[in-house]
Amino acid sequence: MSNNVISPEFDEQGRALRRIRSFVRRQGRLTKGQQYALDTLWPAMGTDYQAQPLDLTALFGRAAPVTLEIGFGMGASLVTMAAAHPEQNFIGIEVHLPGVGACLASAQEAGVSNLRVMCHDAVEVLEQMIPDASLALVQLFFPDPWHKARHNKRRIIQAPFVELVGRKLAAGGVFHMATDWQPYAEHMLAVMSDAAFFRSLSSTGDYVPRPASRPLTKFEQRGQRLGHGVWDLMFAKTV
């Protein structure tokens, strides 16, 4: 597998271009189990970055609705969803290798075969590899909220990114977001409300109750015990 999570970009003089990224890659230590999963399971379930569109039918060996999750962490929720919906295809993107290894190991343990994972910048994957109008669902759960005002520009939910997601979703496809930081939830709602090609699936025009399709994580359960809130937003592509 490739260990480059971003592709270098240069100007006409060959100088590296700086691009604002929504993540900081933390070099966590791989456990022996995670390394073993990467070594043995990546050939079957891993997909290396390439700057050309994927043939999703060939990737999975069948045509089926595709769910793409951005930033799946250790992969517990993603594997649970893939196991619960064998009739669907799932793609997970995560930049942290320990999480990718853990996800692969969990998928093997669960007997999941309808999941493919990538270790690369999700924006580049969407731009270069995911065909337009090919996704049924895009999931973005608990992205880094970048709490400090001077870092807000790093938040992944910005108008250009929402437009990119909109291009990749099929008509009627859904963009599902969740955050435990209320200011970020309000930011998400403001950006999504300004996107002309999305409509809210909330009966009140803002947030929705956690759908049964999104597994409750241990992190979220702990937050609930401490009285922390979680905000889910679901928007459907209209055109």
Swiss-Prot record:
A molecular function GO annotation: tRNA (guanine(46)-N7)-methyltransferase activity
Keywords: Methyltransferase, S-adenosyl-L-methionine, Transferase, tRNA processing
Pathway in which the depicted protein is active: tRNA modification; N(7)-methylguanine-tRNA biosynthesis
Pfam family, one: Methyltransf_4
Enzyme type, top EC level: transferase
Region feature (Interaction with RNA): 150-155
Catalytic activity, as annotated: guanosine(46) in tRNA + S-adenosyl-L-methionine = N(7)-methylguanosine(46) in tRNA + S-adenosyl-L-homocysteine
Secretion signal, residue range per the UniProt entry: none
Catalytic machinery residues: D144
Residues at which S-adenosyl-L-methionine binds: E69, E94, D121, D144
UniProt keyword S-adenosyl-L-methionine present: yes
Annotated EC: 2.1.1.33
Gene Ontology CC annotations of this record: tRNA methyltransferase complex
Gene3D superfamilies named in the record: Vaccinia Virus protein VP39
Residues at which substrate binds: K148, D180, T217, K218, F219, E220
Subunit structure: Monomer.
Record function comment: Catalyzes the formation of N(7)-methylguanine at position 46 (m7G46) in tRNA.
Annotated family: Belongs to the class I-like SAM-binding methyltransferase superfamily. TrmB family.
The protein's name: tRNA (guanine-N(7)-)-methyltransferase
Native source species: Sodalis glossinidius (strain morsitans)
Gene: trmB
